[in-house]
């Protein structure tokens, strides 16, 4: 007998506490596939679940890719062949996770979304997971993933500018991740900086709309936007921190920051 919606949500919370994120995904996927709009809590649980399972593998992929480059530079062909096979295994896992959540978004969540907030949230998620595919895909597959990511981010932006205030954490999180997409995937630093600066300036000009409930998340994302702008405009000398890691003097190379953009 399938678990009730209430039980699935409880089990997802339990799995989160136990750091068993694959099981958290399965429980929240069952809730998301019910055809009913998710509550804010359920939406965030779904996002956290997938972010953890994808985040661990994105970090693994970056580490393995870095090792591959070092071994290639040394001319260690036998090790490089082993590393490439291992990287391909990680990429297969990344693809499966991305395709899984993208299917849930397209088949259930986007179609059942009633509020502007939830529409922005889900279109942003769609943009994020196509972007994650574009991070490691090559040739035509990379172009396809990038095009679909751009399309989803634009759809999210169209709703966000009409239905959410500039200080709303979901609108700010969208701007943060969309700007990272322009910088990393489309190699367009000018567009990335323009988008990030516009979002930051609009939020600063509209601070009176900032609710007490979202103050912490909104100001954090505003800081991340400013951090990325500083890094991107500083002659690109200093790469930014990734979503998974803090900036560190020991970190040799990192990525522009993505924020807690999936949280309320």
Curated annotation (Swiss-Prot):
It comes from the Eukaryota. Residues 236-264 are annotated as: Disordered. One of its GO terms (cellular component) is cell surface. SUPFAM superfamilies: 14-3-3 protein (SSF48445). PROSITE patterns: 1433_1 (PS00796), 1433_2 (PS00797). Residues 236-258 have a biased composition (Low complexity). One of its GO terms (biological process) is regulation of carbohydrate metabolic process. Coiled coil: none annotated. Belongs to the 14-3-3 family. This is 14-3-3 protein homolog. The gene is BMH1.
